[in-house]
Amino acid sequence: MTYTPEKTLFALFAPNDAKKVTLRIYEEGLGGKALKTVNMKRTANEQWTATVKGDLMGKFYTFDMGQGECPGVFAKAVGVNGKRGAIINFSKTDPEGWAQDQHPVTKSPADLVIYEMHHRDFSINRPDAKYPGKFMALTEPWAISHLKELGVNAVHILPSYDYGSVDETRLSDNKYNWGYDPVNYNVPEGGYSTDP
Protein backbone atom coordinates (compact mmCIF):
# COMPACT_ATOMS: atom_id res chain seq x y z
CA MET A 1 0.00 0.00 0.00
CA THR A 2 1.40 3.37 -1.03
CA TYR A 3 -0.57 6.38 0.18
CA THR A 4 -0.75 9.94 -1.13
CA PRO A 5 -3.54 12.44 -0.43
CA GLU A 6 -4.57 12.20 -4.11
CA LYS A 7 -4.60 8.41 -4.48
CA THR A 8 -3.57 5.13 -2.85
CA LEU A 9 -1.89 2.28 -4.72
CA PHE A 10 -2.55 -1.26 -3.55
CA ALA A 11 -0.48 -4.25 -4.68
CA LEU A 12 -0.73 -7.90 -3.75
CA PHE A 13 1.19 -11.06 -4.51
CA ALA A 14 -1.34 -13.82 -5.14
CA PRO A 15 -0.72 -17.39 -6.36
CA ASN A 16 -1.20 -18.15 -10.05
CA ASP A 17 -4.44 -19.99 -9.32
CA ALA A 18 -6.11 -16.74 -8.15
CA LYS A 19 -8.85 -15.96 -10.66
CA LYS A 20 -10.04 -12.72 -9.09
CA VAL A 21 -8.82 -10.42 -6.32
CA THR A 22 -11.15 -7.89 -4.73
CA LEU A 23 -9.98 -4.87 -2.74
CA ARG A 24 -12.35 -3.57 -0.08
CA ILE A 25 -12.10 -0.19 1.68
CA TYR A 26 -13.60 0.22 5.17
CA GLU A 27 -14.22 3.10 7.56
CA GLU A 28 -13.25 1.04 10.61
CA GLY A 29 -10.54 -1.49 11.45
CA LEU A 30 -13.11 -4.02 12.64
CA GLY A 31 -16.78 -4.39 11.75
CA GLY A 32 -18.98 -2.44 9.37
CA LYS A 33 -19.61 -2.76 5.64
CA ALA A 34 -17.19 -1.89 2.86
CA LEU A 35 -17.32 1.72 1.66
CA LYS A 36 -15.86 0.73 -1.69
CA THR A 37 -15.17 -2.50 -3.57
CA VAL A 38 -12.63 -2.59 -6.40
CA ASN A 39 -11.71 -5.48 -8.70
CA MET A 40 -7.92 -5.58 -8.86
CA LYS A 41 -6.02 -6.11 -12.13
CA ARG A 42 -3.38 -8.74 -12.72
CA THR A 43 -0.33 -6.73 -13.82
CA ALA A 44 2.35 -9.41 -13.77
CA ASN A 45 2.77 -13.04 -12.93
CA GLU A 46 1.14 -13.44 -9.49
CA GLN A 47 0.89 -9.64 -8.95
CA TRP A 48 -2.37 -7.71 -8.67
CA THR A 49 -2.78 -3.92 -8.37
CA ALA A 50 -5.46 -1.28 -7.95
CA THR A 51 -5.34 2.49 -7.58
CA VAL A 52 -8.10 4.26 -5.66
CA LYS A 53 -8.40 8.02 -6.18
CA GLY A 54 -9.11 10.34 -3.28
CA ASP A 55 -7.74 10.77 0.22
CA LEU A 56 -8.10 7.46 2.06
CA MET A 57 -6.03 8.45 5.13
CA GLY A 58 -7.34 6.65 8.21
CA LYS A 59 -9.42 4.14 6.28
CA PHE A 60 -8.81 0.38 6.24
CA TYR A 61 -8.52 -2.23 3.48
CA THR A 62 -8.64 -5.95 2.80
CA PHE A 63 -7.88 -8.23 -0.12
CA ASP A 64 -10.20 -11.12 -0.99
CA MET A 65 -9.19 -13.97 -3.32
CA GLY A 66 -12.37 -15.93 -2.62
CA GLN A 67 -11.17 -17.55 0.60
CA GLY A 68 -11.81 -14.75 3.08
CA GLU A 69 -10.45 -11.25 3.58
CA CYS A 70 -6.96 -10.34 4.79
CA PRO A 71 -4.65 -7.30 4.78
CA GLY A 72 -1.94 -9.17 2.84
CA VAL A 73 1.42 -10.40 4.13
CA PHE A 74 3.21 -7.11 3.48
CA ALA A 75 0.89 -4.93 5.60
CA LYS A 76 2.84 -2.61 7.93
CA ALA A 77 -0.13 -1.19 9.85
CA VAL A 78 -3.45 -2.83 10.71
CA GLY A 79 -6.62 -2.26 12.68
CA VAL A 80 -7.43 -4.02 15.92
CA ASN A 81 -6.65 -7.76 15.84
CA GLY A 82 -4.93 -7.43 12.45
CA LYS A 83 -7.99 -8.16 10.32
CA ARG A 84 -7.69 -5.08 8.07
CA GLY A 85 -4.76 -3.07 6.78
CA ALA A 86 -4.59 0.58 7.89
CA ILE A 87 -4.09 3.32 5.32
CA ILE A 88 -1.61 5.74 6.85
CA ASN A 89 1.18 8.08 5.82
CA PHE A 90 4.31 6.52 7.32
CA SER A 91 6.26 9.77 6.97
CA LYS A 92 3.85 11.20 9.57
CA THR A 93 4.04 8.25 11.98
CA ASP A 94 7.71 7.27 11.81
CA PRO A 95 9.87 8.84 14.53
CA GLU A 96 12.36 11.52 13.52
CA GLY A 97 15.47 9.89 12.01
CA TRP A 98 13.71 6.55 11.40
CA ALA A 99 14.78 6.27 7.76
CA GLN A 100 18.42 6.91 8.69
CA ASP A 101 18.52 4.46 11.60
CA GLN A 102 21.24 1.82 11.36
CA HIS A 103 21.61 -1.36 13.36
CA PRO A 104 24.71 -1.84 15.50
CA VAL A 105 27.55 -3.73 13.84
CA THR A 106 29.50 -6.48 15.58
CA LYS A 107 32.80 -7.82 14.29
CA SER A 108 31.80 -11.41 14.86
CA PRO A 109 28.61 -13.24 15.85
CA ALA A 110 30.69 -14.73 18.67
CA ASP A 111 30.79 -11.23 20.23
CA LEU A 112 27.02 -11.18 20.72
CA VAL A 113 25.55 -11.55 24.18
CA ILE A 114 21.88 -12.11 23.33
CA TYR A 115 19.05 -11.66 25.80
CA GLU A 116 15.79 -13.31 24.71
CA MET A 117 13.05 -11.24 26.26
CA HIS A 118 9.31 -11.76 26.39
CA HIS A 119 8.09 -8.24 25.94
CA ARG A 120 5.22 -8.36 28.43
CA ASP A 121 7.19 -10.27 31.08
CA PHE A 122 10.02 -7.74 31.01
CA SER A 123 7.94 -4.95 32.51
CA ILE A 124 4.53 -6.18 33.64
CA ASN A 125 5.39 -6.55 37.35
CA ARG A 126 7.87 -3.71 37.58
CA PRO A 127 6.50 -1.28 40.24
CA ASP A 128 8.25 1.74 38.71
CA ALA A 129 7.11 1.01 35.14
CA LYS A 130 5.04 3.80 33.66
CA TYR A 131 3.96 1.50 30.79
CA PRO A 132 3.94 -2.05 32.22
CA GLY A 133 3.62 -4.70 29.52
CA LYS A 134 3.83 -2.17 26.68
CA PHE A 135 6.44 -1.40 24.01
CA MET A 136 6.90 2.03 25.62
CA ALA A 137 8.32 0.34 28.74
CA LEU A 138 11.55 -0.22 26.80
CA THR A 139 12.03 3.55 26.55
CA GLU A 140 11.95 4.06 30.31
CA PRO A 141 15.29 4.75 32.07
CA TRP A 142 15.03 1.70 34.35
CA ALA A 143 14.69 -0.59 31.30
CA ILE A 144 17.88 0.58 29.60
CA SER A 145 19.75 0.51 32.93
CA HIS A 146 18.60 -3.04 33.60
CA LEU A 147 19.75 -4.27 30.18
CA LYS A 148 23.13 -2.57 30.63
CA GLU A 149 23.52 -4.19 34.06
CA LEU A 150 22.92 -7.60 32.47
CA GLY A 151 25.84 -6.97 30.12
CA VAL A 152 23.91 -7.86 26.98
CA ASN A 153 24.57 -6.21 23.62
CA ALA A 154 21.63 -7.69 21.68
CA VAL A 155 17.99 -8.12 22.68
CA HIS A 156 15.70 -10.61 20.93
CA ILE A 157 12.17 -9.44 21.70
CA LEU A 158 9.46 -12.09 21.59
CA PRO A 159 6.84 -11.69 20.45
CA SER A 160 7.11 -8.37 18.65
CA TYR A 161 4.88 -8.97 15.60
CA ASP A 162 1.09 -9.14 15.45
CA TYR A 163 -0.19 -12.55 16.58
CA GLY A 164 -3.70 -13.94 16.69
CA SER A 165 -4.61 -15.59 19.99
CA VAL A 166 -4.96 -12.46 22.14
CA ASP A 167 -8.06 -10.37 21.46
CA GLU A 168 -6.87 -6.75 21.48
CA THR A 169 -10.39 -5.57 22.32
CA ARG A 170 -10.26 -7.61 25.56
CA LEU A 171 -6.78 -7.07 26.98
CA SER A 172 -8.17 -7.33 30.51
CA ASP A 173 -8.61 -11.09 29.87
CA ASN A 174 -4.84 -11.23 30.55
CA LYS A 175 -4.07 -13.88 27.93
CA TYR A 176 -0.45 -14.87 27.42
CA ASN A 177 1.40 -15.79 24.23
CA TRP A 178 4.90 -16.26 22.85
CA GLY A 179 3.72 -15.36 19.35
CA TYR A 180 3.67 -18.80 17.76
CA ASP A 181 0.48 -17.87 15.88
CA PRO A 182 1.64 -14.96 13.71
CA VAL A 183 -0.93 -12.93 11.79
CA ASN A 184 1.04 -9.96 10.42
CA TYR A 185 4.84 -10.29 10.54
CA ASN A 186 5.50 -6.65 9.62
CA VAL A 187 3.17 -5.14 12.22
CA PRO A 188 3.93 -4.63 15.93
CA GLU A 189 1.60 -6.56 18.26
CA GLY A 190 -1.27 -4.23 19.15
CA GLY A 191 -1.65 -5.62 22.67
CA TYR A 192 1.70 -4.07 23.59
CA SER A 193 0.82 -0.64 22.22
CA THR A 194 -0.76 2.11 24.29
CA ASP A 195 -3.62 2.34 21.77
CA PRO A 196 -4.33 -1.01 20.05
Where are the model-predicted features located?
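Short edge beta-strand/loop segments characteristic of extracellular beta-sandwich folds
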Residues: 8-15
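Conserved, mostly hydrophobic/aromatic
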Residues: 12, 63, 117, 157, ...
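Solvent-exposed serine/threonine-rich low-complexity stretches and specific carbohydrate-binding patches
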Residues: 34-43
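Beta-strand signatures of extracellular beta-sandwich domains
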Residues: 22-24
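Catalytic domains of carbohydrate-active enzymes, especially glycoside hydrolases
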Residues: 142-164
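Aromatic- and acidic-residue-enriched carbohydrate-binding clefts of CAZyme catalytic domains
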Residues: 129-137, 167-196
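The feature marks proteins involved in alpha-glucan
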Residues: 1-7, 42-133
